[in-house]
Amino acid sequence: MTNFQEYQEFKDMYDNAKSMLNSSNHTINYYRQNYDKTILNSFYFIVDMPPYIANTLKSKTPKLKLSLDSLLKNMIEHPEITFKEYLQLEYFLYNAEYILLKNEKNLIYFKIDNCLYQFVIKNTKDGCENFLTTFHKTNIKQLNKDIARYKQIKR
């Protein structure tokens, strides 16, 4: 996010998602079945990826998007992730310690203040769009398991 307007638009999306969740204990499937797909598929550009990540994904654009659906899913499954951490995604991407390639998805790990995070980026088949599909805290055991299974792009 490069300016206040972009920040405010993302904060509005985040706050709307949070208010939807505060009123219930539903799973993401509930929202997918009961809300208009055009609303859930709405997205926000959150950051430009480093060129080598975009190239690895065979992406035609460095733009990374986050859909309302993915944000809701992450807020339900990983409530420990704060708004502030979402704002740090650009920093996290550019300072990732490990980047692993799993099929069409990148598994990216980074450590900040002794906390290990993982996020997954997936792009469309035509390479025109990139989406952040998950973002959560993880542990060294999971990182080591994934290092053993997937192609390592960066360390």
Over which residues does each language-model region extend?
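Ribonuclease/tRNase effector modules and their secretory precursors
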Residues: 1-155
